[in-house]
Structure formats: structure tokens, C-alpha cells
Regions:
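Acidic/aromatic/glycine-rich contiguous surface patches that form carbohydrate-binding/processing clefts
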Residues: 1-118
Length: 118
């Protein structure tokens, strides 16, 4: 493997492992429905590891930057609002299997060039 760093400037934390995975996958530009371990964890009633059954069950809390000072202000939004301007490139074994739709690789309605997405 020859991974490339792609700094996003975020810290992820959750009490629910699937909620955390959904947020991370969304930030990476992948489609959680195409990743079996996430999809199956949300559907399992036999060994439930999560209360998350869909992306609608996840809320994102973002600490507001207060001019570089610690702030107690928090912004809440739905998982669907989360995204990244620079999607990750999956491992070759997953290439063309887990990426989000072409529409998800747009930022402000503008398609990202190939060199940015690699």
C-alpha cells in the first residue's frame, strides 16, 4: 500500500461505532450502503451493535471556531450535509465498488478535477 495523506482538519468521536463509521465514510466520499460491514450492522437485529438504522438517525455536532479560542457554541446538522471537497481514493481492491455517486464528487455544483480526486 502507498496511502496518501489527505488532511481534513476534523476530529471524529461517537458513542455509536456505526454512526462514527457513517460520518467517516461520508467525509471520504464513499457510499456506506456499498460497504457490507456498515450496511449489515445497520440491518442486523440478531447482534445489534448500533441503534442506527439509516443515515437519518445520525446527527453531526460541530464545535464552532471562536477566533481560535475554545468555544461552547455547537452547530447541529444532518449526516447528509456532511461532505468533503476532496474525496479519498479507495484501495485498489475496492476501486469502483464503494465510491459515492458522481453527484457526491461535486463541491458547490462544480465537478472536482481528476487530479484532486486521486
Amino acid at each position: 500500500l502507498a496511502p496518501r495523506d489527505l488532511p481534513l482538519g476534523v476530529i471524529l468521536a461517537s458513542l455509536d461505532p456505526v454512526a462514527l463509521d457513517l460520518a467517516a465514510v461520508r467525509l471520504m466520499g464513499f457510499d456506506a450502503a456499498r460497504i457490507p460491514k456498515i450496511r449489515e450492522a445497520m440491518a442486523s437485529a440478531v447482534l445489534p451493535v448500533t441503534e442506527v438504522r439509516s443515515a437519518d438517525d445520525v446527527e453531526i455536532a460541530e464545535a464552532q471556531d471562536d477566533a481560535g479560542r475554545v468555544s461552547t457554541s455547537v452547530r447541529m446538522y444532518a449526516l447528509d450535509a456532511l461532505g468533503s471537497p476532496r474525496p479519498f481514493v479507495p484501495h485498489p481492491g475496492w476501486l469502483n465498488h464503494i465510491e459515492g455517486s458522481a453527484d457526491e464528487n461535486h463541491v458547490d455544483g462544480v465537478s472536482q478535477p481528476e487530479e484532486v480526486m486521486e
